[in-house]
Amino acid sequence: MTEHFDARGTRDAQTGRDLHSFIAGLPKAELHVHHVGSASPRIVSELAARHPDSSVPTDPEALADYFTFTDFAHFIKVYLSVVDLIRTPEDVRLLTYEVARELARQQVRYAELTITPFSSTRRGIDERAFMDAIEDARKSAEAEFGTVLRWCFDIPGEAGLESAEETVRLATDDRLRPEGLVSFGLGGPEIGVPRPQFKPYFDRAIAAGLRSVPHAGETTGPETVWDALTDLRAERIGHGTSSAQDPKLLAHLAEHRIPLEVCPTSNIATRAVRTLDEHPVKEFVRAGVVVTINSDDPPMFGTDLNNEYAIAARLLDLDERGLAGLAKNSVEASFLDAAGKARIAAEIDTYTAAWLAP
C-alpha cells in the first residue's frame, strides 16, 4: 500500500491554522508530472470502455487494485497498459484537457507536462494530429482554467534508441514542433538503460533550444545522476533519489543550483524508497540542494500535488512560509519566462501574507 500523509487537522504551531487549507489554496507550479500517468480513474475508465480489448479495468474502484505496484518493473508494465488506451487524437485531447482541469483544481498556475509522443505515434496516431491535439487542449485549458501548460518530450528508455531518434525528430522538426514545447527528457527504467547512450539525442535537442531534464537516480545509484549531468547536460534531475548516497554529488547539485524534482509518494509506490520517513528529501535540504515537490503519476499512486506538499510539510517541518518557499522553488526552477515567474511568485507572496494576516 502507498503511504499517505493528510495535513487536515495538522495545525501550525505559531498560527494555529490548518495547513491543509493553506496548501489547497497555495498557488503552485509543477515540474514533474506525466501526461498519461495523470489520467484520472474516471478518464482511464472512459478510455478503457472505448477500447474494450484492453486489460485495463473499466470500473474505477477496480483501478485502485490495478494501480497497486509490487516494484518499479510492475509499475512500468501497468503504465504501458494505460498508454495503450491512447489511440486517437481525441483520446489525446481529452486526456490533456482533463489533466489541466485537475491541475487547476489544485491551484497549479504553471505545469511542465512530460509527454511521450513516441508511444502514440508508434500506435498509429498521425504526428500532426497528435501535436494539434495537445496544443488545442493546452490553449483551451489556459483560456478556461488559467493554467499554463508547457511540454517536455521524453524518450521512453524501455523502447531503446529507435524511440530516442523518433522523439528528437519530433521535438526538433520545425514543421511539427509544438509551440508549448520547452524541454527534452528521458524516462522509463534506469537499470540496463545507461544514460550516456542518449547523449547524441540530447545534444541535438539542446542545440534546438530545448532544456535537458532527464530522470536519473530513481532506481539506480548516484552514478546515473552524474551521467545525466555530464553526458546529458541536465539542468534539472527527475527524482535523483540516490543523490543522497554521494556527498560530492550533493555538493555539486547545491553549488550549481541544479534542482531535484522530488516525488515522495511515487518513490514509495515503486519501492524506490521503503518508507516516507526514510525519504532523502531531508538530506537534500540540509545539503542546500534546490528541492521542488511534484506528483509524478498522481492517480496511479493515489496522490495529488496538494498531498505531496502535505508530506513535505511533515518531513521538513514546514510552516506556511516554508511551504510558500517550496512553491517558489518550483516557480524559479521552471522554464517559464522571467515575467511569468515574477507574476506567480508575487501571487504566492500575496496569498501567504493574506493568510498570515492577523
From Swiss-Prot:
Reactions the enzyme catalyzes: 6-amino-6-deoxyfutalosine + H2O + H(+) = futalosine + NH4(+)
EC number, as in UniProt: 3.5.4.40
Record-level Gene Ontology MF annotations: deaminase activity; hydrolase activity, acting on carbon-nitrogen (but not peptide) bonds, in cyclic amidines; metal ion binding
Record key words, sorted: Hydrolase, Menaquinone biosynthesis, Metal-binding, Zinc
Binding site for Zn(2+): H32, H34, H215, D296
Domain of life, per lineage: Bacteria
Taxonomic classification: Bacteria, Bacillati, Actinomycetota, Actinomycetes, Kitasatosporales
UniProt-listed SUPFAM superfamilies: Metallo-dependent hydrolases (SSF51556)
Positions with a binding annotation for substrate: R87, D154, G188
NCBIfam families: aden_deam, PRK09358.3-1
Protein name: Aminodeoxyfutalosine deaminase
Cofactor info, note text: Binds 1 zinc ion per subunit.
Catalytic residues (positions): E218 (proton donor)
Cofactor(s) required, per the database record: Zn(2+)
The organism of origin for this protein: Streptomyces avermitilis (strain ATCC 31267 / DSM 46492 / JCM 5070 / NBRC 14893 / NCIMB 12804 / NRRL 8165 / MA-4680)
